[in-house]
């Protein structure tokens, strides 16, 4: 039974609140019970400043103050009079939350409200058009000193911006020349490339691990996998500084989906720490990350590491709400915004469900929320709906359209360019077009680089997309900023890695410095305990505490092959390896980490049983259908795909002919639309084959080509274009990104390096396919300057664009830029170029 209110663990003692004037008025103003009263608000901030000056205040009180400063700036900045503005400024300076002075809603003509001392202090802190707090300034100075740094801070603290800005200073002063960024995903690499290009002019950025040129000044952007390949060929290259973003990946060695990447990063850190290269770790707000887990990975003395983490005061804040539905179908919210000084989470009526409601049905929860979303949030402000599956994403998006929630009157040029791109390259029938035209975007792992980038830019910078519906894949991309976040999930939060870190990472999407300094977070009761979930929300601004010893114990009980590879590697010297204690050291090659040392031995035995020249011939002719087909057949046998526990490898990839055709099409730069039409035509011409719709072990539908002979059509249905085309588009997007770009390339790469180890020969054709999915020199040149979208690469390598290349087939960047600016603003090619160079 629903309660009318629930007790909250108050952020401060009653004796403290007794000294704050008009707190109840401020709380009522926030609830729209009171109206704006200049006198009362001035008295409230007077009492805050008085308390700050007369007491030793702790982090809890500071958060309370930040909450109300964020509230007043975000909601009433245009009404703030001179007297109140000066008081707010004084508090901001006293609490060292300087960046708020430059908030877009607040900074206009602000300088005249400072005294001379404050003006000098502000001038000193102003770096790269940003105003730094003491902590940020300290971090900057330690980077300038090229220290080892562990920088853990809340979302929107500006960690990556501080690093890029300071690295820029070091490069321009010739203090450093070669910088390495280790980043977990290609999406983050693309985002970093964009940020670096905006800040550091004329710097060479390299993503290709096979580059051997020793540049005088260069920034390398690598995933862990790519760094190992680079290191294999460039062991003598001296790196001046290393930055590892998303370093929390290191705690995921007990997560089945994450352990491979975690151990690859662990191996890299072992290499870097042995070289004595200074390193910066960036990660979300974790309590003492160096002392709890990072120190176990690197061979660096504690006194040589600067740790910036605990008691970090965020500049932004959130309102937290739990949504519940009672037995009468009435939708309520409970306000758990602890930092507002609330003592009780009061129950507030929102609306009544128009149909029957099952509290254990996520579909019913989605329906009642979407049907009443205008009563829950201010729909003029951007929102994100987080859910657990791609099917749920589509259902929610379709209901938003049905209710005309996000209808937009005008479409920006960039949005029109995105729609044009989808129509030409993905398919006219793709439902994402309908979503976008109705002001809604969906975000899932299979969307290609162009769609992902445009959606993220439009959502952050334009007004076309008001709502975003996503799964946990949002956590792997760049920061998307929305004032409102609604979470619709069942009993358990669906995390990629550590649950507490991922949960806080998601919550951090709502409040962002310079955009929305105070956000609104909504979670559903489902059949969870509301008090417990409410507490989880209002403690999400606290640092995560990691029990890494417990994680190590879990790993030791059932270590997988990659963990064993690390634990037995004679080249690794780390406390983690010592604690894993899995036997005598052995000589392990760096590239054995891709499949594990035991699997590597089996693979090399199989390779030795055939003529090496046979494999070399297949690899050199990769892209030719017959040779690619033979190569994939060999890979399936060498790596025993049928025994692989991964459904995609053991089931989806056993159709060798389909995988070969798909791979050749990808390597030739074919669009999704073209590949789908080719497959449909293939089945129509070859009566022995059928296109069918199946379900995977998770119940999600996908389309596949099957040979009619010996196929049981139970649990399948024949593909009908009008009904199943969207399923096919999603399937093809998935197959390209996951089956070809991830799995197939992984096995091609491993085979190639084992062959190369034997005959010492470089096969450029393979390296180019692995890095660029092409062997065309012009396409590779485009890729090297950051143009990664296949449609743009295919267009720009046509004969009519030869003027953009020099005699070595390198890009004339200025000429290409000039051409891009001449294109219509609704042309997708314009943004494929200008977004990255």
Predicted regions and their residues:
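Conserved C-terminal RecA-like helicase domain
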Residues: 110-123, 130, 134-141, 150-157, ...
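A short beta-strand element within the Helicase C-terminal
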Residues: 238-243, 467-491, 519-524
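Structural recognition of the conserved hydrophobic beta-strand(s) that form the central parallel beta-sheet
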Residues: 181, 220-223, 243, 278-284, ...
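Conserved segment of the helicase C-terminal RecA-like domain
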Residues: 273-280, 480, 492-493, 499-541
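SF2 helicase catalytic motif II
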Residues: 233-278
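Conserved interdomain linker/interface between the two RecA-like ATPase lobes of SF2 helicase motors
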Residues: 270, 277-399, 441
């Amino acid at each position: 039974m629903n309660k009318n209110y629930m007790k909250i663990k108050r952020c401060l003692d009653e004796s403290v609140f007794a000294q704050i004037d008009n707190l109840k008025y401020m709380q009522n103003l926030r609830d729209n019970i009171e109206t704006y009263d200049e006198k009362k608000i001035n008295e409230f901030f007077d009492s805050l400043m008085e308390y700050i000056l007369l007491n030793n205040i702790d982090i809890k009180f500071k958060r309370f103050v930040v909450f109300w400063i964020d509230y007043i700036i975000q909601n009433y900045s245009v009404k703030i009079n001179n007297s109140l503005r000066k008081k707010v400024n004084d508090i901001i300076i006293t609490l060292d939350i300087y960046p708020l002075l430059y908030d877009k809603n607040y900074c206009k003509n602000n300088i005249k409200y400072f005294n001379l001392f404050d003006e000098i202090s502000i001038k000193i802190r102003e770096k790269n058009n940003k105003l730094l707090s003491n902590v940020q300034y300290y971090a900057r100075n330690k980077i300038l000193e090229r220290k080892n740094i562990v920088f853990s801070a809340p979302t929107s603290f500006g960690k990556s911006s501080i690093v890029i800005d300071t690295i820029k200073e070091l490069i321009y002063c010739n203090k450093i020349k070669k910088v390495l960024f280790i980043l977990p995903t290609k999406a983050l690499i693309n985002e970093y490339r964009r940020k670096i290009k905006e800040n550091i002019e004329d710097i060479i950025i390299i993503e290709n691990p096979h580059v051997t040129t020793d540049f005088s000044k260069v920034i390398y952007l690598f995933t862990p996998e790519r760094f190992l390949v680079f290191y294999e060929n460039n062991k003598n290259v001296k790196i001046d500084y290393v930055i590892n973003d998303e370093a929390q990946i290191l705690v995921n060695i007990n997560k089945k989906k994450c352990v491979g990447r975690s151990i690859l990063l662990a191996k890299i850190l072992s290499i870097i720490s042995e070289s004595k290269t200074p390193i910066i770790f960036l990660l979300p707000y974790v309590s003492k990350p160096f002392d709890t887990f990072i120190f176990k990975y690197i061979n660096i003395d504690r006194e040589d590491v600067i740790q910036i983490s605990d008691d970090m005061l965020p500049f932004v804040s959130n309102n937290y709400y739990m949504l519940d539905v009672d037995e009468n179908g009435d939708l309520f919210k409970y306000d758990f915004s602890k930092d507002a000084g609330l003592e009780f989470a009061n129950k507030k009526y929102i609306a009544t469900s128009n149909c029957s409601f099952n509290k254990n049905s996520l579909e019913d929860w989605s329906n009642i929320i979407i049907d009443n979303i205008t009563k829950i949030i201010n729909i003029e402000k951007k929102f994100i709906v987080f859910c657990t599956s791609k099917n749920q994403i589509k259902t929610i998006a379709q209901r938003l359209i049905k209710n005309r929630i996000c209808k937009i009157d005008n479409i920006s040029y960039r949005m029109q360019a995105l729609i044009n791109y989808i129509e030409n390259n993905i398919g006219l029938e793709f439902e994402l077009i309908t979503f976008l035209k109705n002001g809604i975007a969906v975000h899932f792992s299979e969307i290609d680089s162009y769609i992902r980038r445009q959606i993220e830019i439009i959502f952050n910078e334009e007004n076309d997309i008001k709502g975003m519906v996503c799964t946990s894949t949002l956590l792997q991309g760049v920061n998307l900023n929305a004032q409102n976040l609604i979470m619709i999930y069942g009993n358990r939060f669906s995390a990629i890695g550590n649950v507490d870190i991922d949960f806080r990472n998601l919550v951090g999407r709502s409040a962002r410095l310079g955009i929305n300094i105070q956000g609104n977070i909504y979670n559903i009761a489902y059949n969870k305990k509301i008090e417990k979930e409410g507490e989880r929300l209002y403690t999400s601004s606290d640092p995560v505490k990691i029990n890494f010893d417990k994680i190590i114990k879990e790993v030791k009980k059932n270590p997988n092959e990659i963990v064993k590879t690390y634990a037995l590697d004679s080249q690794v010297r780390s406390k983690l390896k010592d604690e894993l204690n899995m036997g005598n050291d052995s000589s392990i090659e760096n590239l054995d980490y891709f499949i594990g040392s035991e699997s590597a031995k089996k693979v090399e035995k199989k390779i030795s049983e055939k003529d090496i020249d046979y494999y070399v011939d297949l690899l050199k002719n990769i892209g030719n259908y017959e040779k690619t087909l033979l190569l994939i057949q060999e890979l399936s046998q060498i790596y025993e795909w049928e025994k692989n526990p991964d459904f995609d490898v053991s089931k989806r990839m056993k159709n060798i002919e389909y995988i070969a055709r798909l791979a050749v099409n990808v390597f030739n730069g074919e669009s999704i639309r073209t590949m789908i039409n080719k497959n449909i035509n293939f089945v129509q011409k070859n009566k022995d084959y059928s296109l069918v719709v199946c379900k995977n072990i998770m119940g999600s539908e996908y389309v596949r080509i099957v040979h009619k002979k010996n196929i049981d059509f139970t649990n399948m249905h024949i593909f009908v274009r009008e009904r199943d085309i969207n399923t096919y588009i999603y399937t093809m997007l998935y197959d390209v990104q996951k089956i070809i770009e991830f799995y197939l390339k992984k096995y091609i790469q491993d085979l190639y390096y084992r062959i190369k180890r034997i005959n010492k020969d470089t096969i450029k054709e393979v390296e180019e396919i692995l890095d660029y999915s092409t062997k065309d020199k012009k396409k590779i040149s485009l890729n090297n300057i950051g143009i990664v979208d296949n449609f743009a690469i295919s267009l720009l390598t046509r004969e009519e664009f030869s003027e953009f290349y020099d005699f070595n087939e390198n890009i004339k960047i200025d000429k290409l830029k000039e051409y891009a600016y001449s294109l219509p603003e609704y042309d997708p090619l314009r943004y494929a170029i200008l977004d990255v160079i």
